[in-house]
Amino acid sequence: MKPGVSVVITSCNRIELLKRTIESFNTMNTYPIAEFIIIDDSGNREAHQRIIELYPDYTCIFNSSNIGLIDSIDRAYSMVKTKYVFHIEDDWEFIKSGFIEPSLKIIENNPMVMQVWVSNIHNQPLDIEPLIADGVHYRYASLDGMDHLWHGFTFHPTIRSMRVYRVAAPWSQWSTSEDFLALRECKIGQEYFMRGFRAAVLPDSYCIHTGDQDTTWNIGQK
């Protein structure tokens, strides 16, 4: 039996970007998904109702007020019932198929992988040493950037085990609302790094970023 995978999508009143993300994911994904969970942090009931209408078969969580990205993730992950979760923000477009299968091979063969990136569009530095898991080639995200503060943790599209998530859960405990997003990634990544975890990166990029400029997340969260 294949390992169970749920998809968690964080969104904040960007319906068109969300639609593009989900459509491209469903077009390019080749792995059975147990459940889709969308968490809407807009505080806008009309926007949330629109999401429900678009995706009646998905689990749609509504935050009545804006609680921020990290708290939204913790809330959504509390509802995940599967062993693994594929994490997506609402502003990505998948352009290549077959990304979950190789990611799972890495995680299942290396228990110290905190997440597997399915995109490296910013060409973040990677370790020189190539690794292989059940025929899948990958590398670790390098530790030589950002003055050794960042350890490869990202909110970009990734797959992780719920076991690893719980090691440092809830993520909201490691930063404050005043922290900008990159610093929050650094702080959470530091917790995993101190426990011996690393981020794995597939050799190909399976998706591209479509958002950034059209966001309603506040600066401390997005």
Feature annotation, model-predicted:
Residues 97-115:
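Conserved donor-nucleotide/metal-binding helix-loop-beta segment in metal-dependent transferases, i.e.
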Residues 1-23:
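N-proximal low-complexity "stem/linker" segments adjacent to membrane-targeting elements
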Residues 20, 150-222:
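C-terminal catalytic/acceptor-binding lobe
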Residues 63-79:
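Glycine-rich, basic loop-to-helix element that forms the pyrophosphate-binding segment
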Residues 23-33:
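Short, acidic, metal-binding catalytic loop of nucleotide-sugar glycosyltransferases
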Residues 85:
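Short aromatic/hydrophobic "clamp" motif used to bind/position activated sugar donors
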Residues 38-48:
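A conserved acidic beta->alpha catalytic loop
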Residues 116-130:
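Short beta-strand-to-loop element that shapes/binds the nucleotide-sugar donor at the catalytic cleft/hinge
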